[in-house]
């Protein structure tokens, strides 16, 4: 896959200089073509910029109105496809493949066509958290035919072998070879994926607390999957405010079938889409809900410093983080300032994860199910350096868990009151 190299930067500077000279000193003829170190032909700066955009998938540069919508494409009554991606990682799931996320009611044989040519190797990969529900999630793996470049693939045709019914699925993401990603290529250091915002699950003030507190902790982007039709006016106003201020990205998410036919409201779809959305874009991505906060334990270390230490081993792709249940006795925001009593027990089963997205192939709700290389590791952290505060309406006793309040209390109160007043919540 082409990359942004020093020679391309030098070429860009040289072209800019030439354009300036030509503008001030017109000449009869111009040099027709330039070449980079790979022999790629460039006629102007625009072609270089086009090449750069092929290398890194930048969502905000895609002129597609559906980019912030999880688009389910119907193959037939028993199959929906979405979020197709090219996968340039040479790992334990094969190389090179175009992959398609699918909800299906039963396993069947499928074929794929890429740029008019049939894929010679097609297989289904089942997610580990389907729990024998009617609708189950799979990844359809389609081997890239020889002679086709990933960057020239814009869609894949998925065909049910028995009926010949098909659907064309646009490529949504381009996943780079994770071994050649450099630190300066990430847009964000830390982001959060919120798999689902249910219409009556939280009020607008809880959202304000969640966004402001995580911003204070250094989170640069929060991705929220929600069905806008289920939200009340205050919630819509609050989400729009933060979306307009670029602190959150809203992704519209509406299942194409009944929720009771799929495990846990179909959150595997949003978790996986958000994993792909952050791959190559964010260094560390957290998966948690609005009533959960990742908390660094050591006072002198920030969240980013704590996470960086936990991922010091470059083969670690995921950290399963233990949590403490906090008694949400006072049911008004900011919860983190008013509720500080937890149970003594550390919860190590229903963990939450922070991951290096490019190293993960399958992410679950509470654990990482598969990494992309056999030598990559998913490890568990018992809460000594990092833990999750989970606020629940239960009587927990009797430990003090006021780390968030002590560290960010004054700033959070100021920012919370400011936004609540501004939006008249």
Curated annotation (Swiss-Prot):
Can also use Fe(2+) and Co(2+). GO terms for molecular function: beta-N-acetylglucosaminylglycopeptide beta-1,4-galactosyltransferase activity; glycosyltransferase activity; metal ion binding; UDP-galactosyltransferase activity. Pfam families: Glyco_transf_92. GO terms for biological process: glycosylation; N-glycan processing; protein galactosylation. It is an enzyme of class 2 (transferase). The keyword Membrane applies. It is found in: Golgi apparatus, Golgi stack membrane. The chain crosses the membrane at residues 9-29. Catalyzes the transfer of beta-galactose from UDP-galactose to position 4 of alpha-1,6-linked fucose at the reducing end GlcNAc in N-glycan cores. Involved in susceptibility to the nematotoxic C.cinerea galectin Cgl2, likely by contributing to the synthesis of core alpha-1,6-fucosylated N-glycans to which Cgl2 binds. PANTHER family: GH12965P, GLYCOSYLTRANSFERASE FAMILY 92 PROTEIN. This is Beta-1,4-galactosyltransferase galt-1. It comes from Caenorhabditis elegans. The gene is galt-1.
